[in-house]
Amino acid sequence: VTEALLRRLDVATEAALEAGALLRSYVGGTLAIEEKRPGDLVTAADRASEDLILKILRRHFPEDVILTEESGQQGSPEGAYAWMIDPLDGTTNFAHGYPFAAVSIGLLQGREPVLGVVCDVFRGDLFRAVQGMGATRNRQPIRVSTTAELSRSLLVTGFAYDRRETPDNNYAEFCHFTHLTQGVRRGGSAALDLAYVATGQLDGYWERGLSPWDIAAGIVLVREAGGKVTAYDGSPVDVYSGRLLASNGWLHAALQEELAQVQPLPVSFPMRRDPRPAYQNRESLPVERVEFETEVVEE
């Protein structure tokens, strides 16, 4: 592990913790909400978190490329390192007061994820990993589960924003695995889904329609916790491909085999749109206040 990566880990940790604290300050207040496209929300909290993270990263690493969900790419494309930032992964959850959202900061060297920091906004947990150094939650080592049978597994997935318009919408896969496992969850934050695969609380994760900022950090967490991350067919994962399969390793071959057998369900219903403006008569949604009592243990 190079000194350059360790420096970036420290700065990413600082940025994630400060952004998490900032996002918690919005809890209990009201949020101005926009709908970028059906089901895809952005709030003032997203933008404030992104501004804070960008300020910290630019101050320390002006030469690095930065790709964020809200602002796109910044910096020289010739940079050796590229940051993948989701300032609020789980915006819809956050806007509704559902406590499952995260700050996700990943780092690529070339096209390879080498560093990941994920801060659970509501619980305050801090997940960190660097290639070759293992993975931690609140500075304590984490490992994937040893579940070796699909029938004993708990999986997690998600659905893309275009799920109403395409037959390749993950509905068939969701139904398929629901019958084969102890359950399939839909968390609403890819970063936290992957973090919980890394801790062993979930055994596997698959999803399509992903962006690099959704998964860059989580990929490193799962790998460094002893898990496996690939494309659906087992080939090396590309963070820009939009598809991902992650598991504890024990289940990976079985998950690949089952995914290959699933046929998409036909889209037989049109998207129903309310003719009224989004969130008519309320410019913002209330977010329930949650009290936090968290402490980051220093090494």
Identify the residue ranges that each predicted region occupies.
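Small-residue (primarily alanine) positions within well-ordered alpha-helices
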Residues: A12, A16-A19, S49, G116, ...
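Residue-level signal for inorganic ion chemistry
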Residues: L23, D46, L57, T91, ...
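Short secondary-structure boundary/capping segments
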Residues: I33-E34, R58, Q73-S76, V118-C119, ...
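DPxDG-like acidic metal-binding loop motif
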Residues: P77-T136
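An extended, acidic
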Residues: R143-E299
